[in-house]
Amino acid sequence: MTIMQGRSTVRQSPLQPGDPAPDFVLPAVDRDGTVSLADYRGKAPVLLAPMRGLYCAFCRRQIAQMGFTRQKLRALGVEVLAIVATTPERARLYYRFRPAGVPLAADPHLTTLRAYGVPHRALTPEVSQIFASRLSDLAHELKIPATDINEIQSALCRRDGYEPTQTDEEDLQRHGGQFVGQFLVDRGGIVRWINIEGAAEGEAGVGKFPSDDELLAAARASLGLGPGERS
């Protein structure tokens, strides 16, 4: 199954290790043309990281982190692809001035998140409060001297050089309470490892991204790599 931009097959539960990973064709952000899972088939395993839109401070931070993580995973022979849920034009504008250091694709309609079965909840006041609480935790971690959620969001935006646009607001309203995940897919197109936001820790896991050590350990274990081995 190949997912084209704007067309979505919705899974009711996340893909599991051993499942075939649905292919996709999405606009590239860091270069011209498109990017697909088929680009990696037969060549290298790839860590896929579909994110929310640029409005998400956690996702902006995680994509920046992946620029460093990528170098460590490539030493194991593993490629990385981040997918940001906004229009290619919006993503290119933001990352033109803040290069991510990782290959990027744009998926404004959440086709990959839905096809890979990543949970989605309506953006109820309760769900909004979960995200607000985690933003407060992030502000504390970054030593941002603010307690009001609007002040925290503004401070995080300034820190990232991010100015919200109408496109971002439309993305937020359309996406609702979308969670994210990471999927390690081998060169044969089979899922070998997954991590779903909040699955292990509940609300405390919202906004968290695996550490480099966790990702490297997952790559070695799921791909059967010994010390010093590459995929």
Region spans (language model):
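A short, polar/charged loop-to-alpha-helix boundary motif
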Residues: 198-224
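Short active-site neighborhood of thiol/selenol oxidoreductases, capturing the structured segment around
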Residues: 35-67, 79-80
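Thiol/selenol-based redox catalytic cores and closely related redox-interacting motifs
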Residues: 107-202
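N-terminal "domain-start" segment that seeds a small globular fold
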Residues: 2-38
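Short, positively charged
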Residues: 4-5, 155-166, 220-227
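Short loop/turn microsegments at loop-to-beta-strand junctions
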Residues: 22, 47, 179-181
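Catalytic metal- and UDP-sugar-binding loop of GT-A-like glycosyltransferases, i.e.
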Residues: 50, 83, 185
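Structural microenvironment flanking redox-active thiols in thiol-disulfide oxidoreductases
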Residues: 62-115
